[in-house]
Every structure is written in structure tokens, then in C-alpha cells.
Curated annotation (Swiss-Prot):
It comes from the Eukaryota. This is UPF0235 protein C15orf40. One of its GO terms (cellular component) is mitochondrion. It comes from Homo sapiens (Human). Keywords: Phosphoprotein. The modification Phosphoserine is found at S116. SMART domains: DUF167. HAMAP family: UPF0235. Residues 1-55 are annotated as: Disordered. Pfam families: DUF167. The gene is C15orf40. Residues 1-12 have a biased composition (Basic residues). Belongs to the UPF0235 family. The keyword Phosphoprotein applies.
């Protein structure tokens, strides 16, 4: 049998069909009130911020925008803001990802962010898309800029 330091795991050897022994691990029982090292215990788990209509914050802290895309339009425009999504007209055909690339370019211009900070998260082949913003910004700022752009049309 193997001898291990106290406090690790207990190992038991059970016979195998081939004649060799197989080791089984069993966790040692925890003491009442014992805490694990390095982990803080909070009473309530951290919750993401409630969504502000189509703009929300994901668990990693990135701002996300729900988009309803309308590819093949004459010009790029934010046409409407609803509780579910931001309606965006895109002046690119919906083929080979052209409309997705144009959507990210247009949103980066409207939101005054770098193109690399606006990433398509979900909906590559759908009109319902989720765009993730990698830049540090607040949902309120994003919603304000989108409303401002929607009023132009």
C-alpha cells in the first residue's frame, strides 16, 4: 500500500481483472467551519447589471448589444431602438460575412470605438445578432450614442 502525508487523500487498492491493483481516490472529510485557502467566501454571488433594453453587460464585464440587422439597405443607419434590439440597416449584401463586417465597422464609427473593440459575438448567419464591445465603457454611454444616431434618421 502507498503511504501519503496526512491531509491529502486516502488511496485504496482494489484488485483488477488482470491481476494488477487499481487505485481509488476518496476525499478526506472536511472539518466544520473550515475554509479553503485563497478563496473568499461571499454571502451573495456577484450578479450582472440588469439589461438596459438591448444593451447589457455579460458576466465577464463586457457590454453587449442585441442587434436586428437589415442587410442590403441603401445606407448604414440605426433605424429604431426597441426593448428587445437595436434595428440597424446595413449597406452591404448578406453574403460571405460582408454585412457582419460592415455592421462592426458602422457600430465602431457610431460608438466612437476602435474597429477591433467591436466584435460579433453571436448570430453570424442570422438577422438577430449580439455584438460585444471589448472597450471599457458603460451601457448608459452606449445607449445614449445609439439613441443620438437613431434620431438622425
Amino acid at each position: 500500500m502507498l503511504r501519503l502525508r496526512s491531509g491529502l487523500r486516502h488511496l485504496r487498492a482494489t484488485p483488477n481483472t488482470r491481476g494488477s491493483a487499481r487505485l481509488l481516490c476518496a476525499e478526506m472529510p472536511k472539518k466544520a467551519g473550515a475554509t479553503t485557502k485563497g478563496k473568499s467566501q461571499s454571502k451573495e454571488p456577484e450578479r450582472p447589471l440588469p439589461p438596459l433594453g438591448p444593451v447589457a453587460v455579460d458576466p465577464k464585464g463586457c457590454v453587449t448589444i442585441a442587434i436586428h440587422a437589415k442587410p442590403g439597405s441603401k445606407q448604414n443607419a440605426v433605424t429604431d431602438l426597441t426593448a428587445e434590439a437595436v434595428n440597424v440597416a446595413i449597406a452591404a449584401p448578406p453574403s460571405e460575412g460582408e454585412a457582419n463586417a460592415e455592421l462592426c465597422r458602422y457600430l465602431s464609427k457610431v460608438l466612437e470605438l476602435r474597429k477591433s473593440d467591436v466584435v460579433l459575438d453571436k448570430g453570424g448567419k442570422s438577422r438577430e445578432k449580439v455584438v460585444k464591445l471589448l472597450a471599457s465603457t458603460t451601457p448608459e454611454e452606449i445607449l445614449e450614442k445609439l439613441k443620438k444616431e437613431a434620431k438622425k434618421t
